[in-house]
Amino acid sequence: AKADLAPVHFFAPSPASRIRWDNTQDTPLPPEMKVGDNPLEGAVFDYYLAQPATGPITLTISDPSNATIREFSSIAPPPDTTMPNVPEYWLMAPTVLKTTAGHHRFAWDLRYPDPPTLNFSYYGNMIDYREYTLNWHALPGQTYISTVVGPMVPAGTYTATLAVGGRKYARQFSVVQDPRVN
């Protein structure tokens, strides 16, 4: 009820677990095969906007020393024009914050930014496309666009700061080790 009265409400996130996908390289299921949706992975942030945002909004993730790890925006990044060697329906859409009125959910995969890469083939020569090997558990729309992803953050306490209309809303959250690892 309190969120209904505030122009912006940034909900306290639950702890996020560092869980990695396996590395099995095999043929994925065809995209037309019905499969269940996986839960969002990483840190999940919920925010409420009583009115549409009048400008861009940002979500900044900071480490315990207040250094910025990642920043996300409501402005889409420029598209990567390098063609992939797989159908584009496998690739994940860019992560963009929503600015419409209402409740929104955003997931951060607990990773640092992707490193810059050069497009090399398996044989070591430069190529003019992005080369992917899809895992057997690949799902349409959930394959990273970058062929090399950034490393995961270590377990610890982090701060997420949502900036909307010139105001900032900060929430601390914890990243915990995979509970299956001891």
Regions found by a protein language model. Give the residues of each.
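C-terminal low-complexity, glycine/proline- and small-hydrophobic-enriched intrinsically disordered tails
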Residues: 1-182
